[in-house]
Amino acid sequence: MHTNGPVFAGWDGSVIQAQQLQQQLAQRVLLHDEVSATPQLLAGFDVGFEDDGQSTRAAAVLLDAHTLLPLETHVARVPTSMPYVPGLLSFRELPALLQALALLSRTPDLVFIDGQGIAHPRRLGIAAHFGVVTGLPCIGIAKQRLAGSFAEPGPERGDHTPILLGGAQIGWALRSKPRCNPLIVSPGHRVSMQGALGWTLRTLRSYRLPEPTRLADRLASRRGKMPALAADTPLLF
């Protein structure tokens, strides 16, 4: 895989300029569906930190789009390049994510990332940032709200309400599992608002998280221990 350009071209390392870059990159986000009508491959990504935050670990899982079984799993580790700054997490996570993407043997048709898409104060969470840099269709799946407000969705699986910021919709609050807090679902790049919701519902099984980010989360939390692949014993978790 190759990216469409430098990750942080022109950034001097300051918070103010990072916020300005976010606003500029947000203008390049495409919010219409460009996902293949018959996608073959999905990917899930999640990021964690090791060694007291000195090392950034990105987990990547490539899945069959029809069975949702994993075909490849990879973990990339890079030195953490900046401290945690609220609203600028993508600058911290993106280098490791790009390394993990490069480990995949095939290009995914659609990417799910554990984090925000455009449901972000400057409309550029990690899934949007990753999408603009790589050109890949992306969806952000977050466990908590970062921006905007929403009415609590109904109690049943699939119930959803729009997340609004400044009068505009930036995502969905989705009840992916009864008696669980809603997920924050938002398009990242080359996916519409309805497309982000539809693909998330399509990739849910009996868990709170959709399969791509659920498997990536498992891999990331195991510090590199791999789940079974589709060619091996079927997954039973």
Curated annotation (Swiss-Prot):
Q: Which GO molecular function terms does the record list?
A: deoxyribonuclease V activity; magnesium ion binding; RNA endonuclease activity, producing 5'-phosphomonoesters; single-stranded RNA binding
Q: Name one GO cellular component term.
A: cytoplasm
Keyword terms, alphabetized = Cytoplasm, DNA damage, DNA repair, Endonuclease, Hydrolase, Magnesium, Metal-binding, Nuclease
* Gene3D superfamilies named among the record's database cross-references: archaeoglobus fulgidus dsm 4304 superfamily
Q: Which reaction does it catalyse?
A: Endonucleolytic cleavage at apurinic or apyrimidinic sites to products with a 5'-phosphate
Protein's cellular compartments:
Cytoplasm
Enzyme Commission number, as recorded:
3.1.21.7
User: Would you kindly state one Gene Ontology biological process term found in this protein's UniProt entry?
Assistant: DNA repair
Query: Which positions in this protein are listed as binding Mg(2+)?
Result: D46, D114
- The annotated site for Interaction with target DNA falls at Y84
- What superkingdom does the record give? Bacteria
Q: Which InterPro entries match?
A: Endonuclease-V
| Main localization (coarse) | cytoplasm
Give the required cofactors. Mg(2+)
What is this protein's function per UniProt? DNA repair enzyme involved in the repair of deaminated bases. Selectively cleaves double-stranded DNA at the second phosphodiester bond 3' to a deoxyinosine leaving behind the intact lesion on the nicked DNA.
Write out the similarity annotation: Belongs to the endonuclease V family.
Under the heading HAMAP family, the entry gives: Endonuclease_5 (MF_00801)
Protein name in the entry: Endonuclease V
Q: Which organism is it from?
A: Xanthomonas oryzae pv. oryzae (strain PXO99A)
